[in-house]
Design a protein with these regions (language model features):
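Short, solvent-exposed loop/beta-turn-alpha elements that line the ligand-binding surface or hinge
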Residues: 176
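Short beta-strand segments
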Residues: 1-3, 23-25, 49-51
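Short acidic-hydrophobic, aromatic-tinged amphipathic segments that line or gate anion-handling sites
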Residues: 1-4, 58, 187-191
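Conserved N-terminal phosphate-binding loop of PLP-dependent enzymes in the Aspartate aminotransferase
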Residues: 13, 24, 73-76
Length: 207
């Protein structure tokens, strides 16, 4: 174990001639640095997982919307959405959109926010003040785009952000396209399966 930040641990490992491979999970910017370190040292193998914009696709023939809502909420908001495979995009058939959103709201009302060491709480603070500001900027972006904030959207003392569901998100929106890495679920509706597949695949990320 080599504990430390990027300068103390990451960069030395990336540049060291005796290190044959580095695997990194994190931001695209840092992933590019590891490729640079490898190119400037011993051409070590670099394995990267740099971000995600995972879609949850819900068709109109779904049998149990309550179960779907539970999975969507868990996928989007577990660990405050600070998870590379978080389901941060809900792509839902227009015929069941409203019914599903109602159930998602009911699920979220059961998720209590507070001290993460308290077993009654499901939600805690974000990882850092800097990341809190990044997530808050996306909340501001939703308002700038005049999108419908269906649930949440508020920030609390410290670096807490309510789990937030934003409806009517265009595939051209930053909320649809960029990894937020926080408790913000974007909702985009579709009318047929071909449109759903196209929306799900419309991302630069591998996840």
């Amino acid at each position: 174990v080599a504990p430390g930040g990027g300068r103390e641990a990451g960069e030395p490992l990336g540049r060291h001639p005796d290190v044959a491979m580095v695997s990194f999970t994190g931001s695209t910017a840092t992933g590019r640095l590891f490729l640079k370190y490898a190119a400037e040292s011993n051409l070590k193998r670099v394995v990267l997982e740099c971000g995600g914009k995972n879609p949850a696709v819900v068709m109109n023939d779904v049998e149990d919307l309550d179960l779907v809502a539970q999975h969507v909420v868990n996928g989007a908001f577990w660990n405050m959405g600070e998870n590379c495979s978080a389901s941060s995009r809900l792509i839902v058939h227009a015929e069941v959109r409203e019914a599903l959103l109602e159930r998602i709201g009911a699920q979220l009302r059961e998720w209590r926010m507070g001290d993460p060491l308290d077993p009654r709480n499901r939600l805690g603070a974000l990882v850092s003040p800097a990341h809190f500001e990044k997530v808050r900027a996306y909340l501001d972006q939703a308002r700038t785009e005049r999108l419908a904030v269906r649930f949440g959207g508020a920030t609390e003392a410290g670096i807490f952000v309510e789990p937030t569901v934003v409806d009517g998100v265009s595939p051209h929106s930053r909320l649809f396209r960029e990894e937020i890495f926080g408790p913000l679920l974007s909702v985009t509706s579709f009318d047929d399966i071909d449109e759903a597949i196209a929306l799900a695949n419309d991302t630069v990320y591998g996840l």
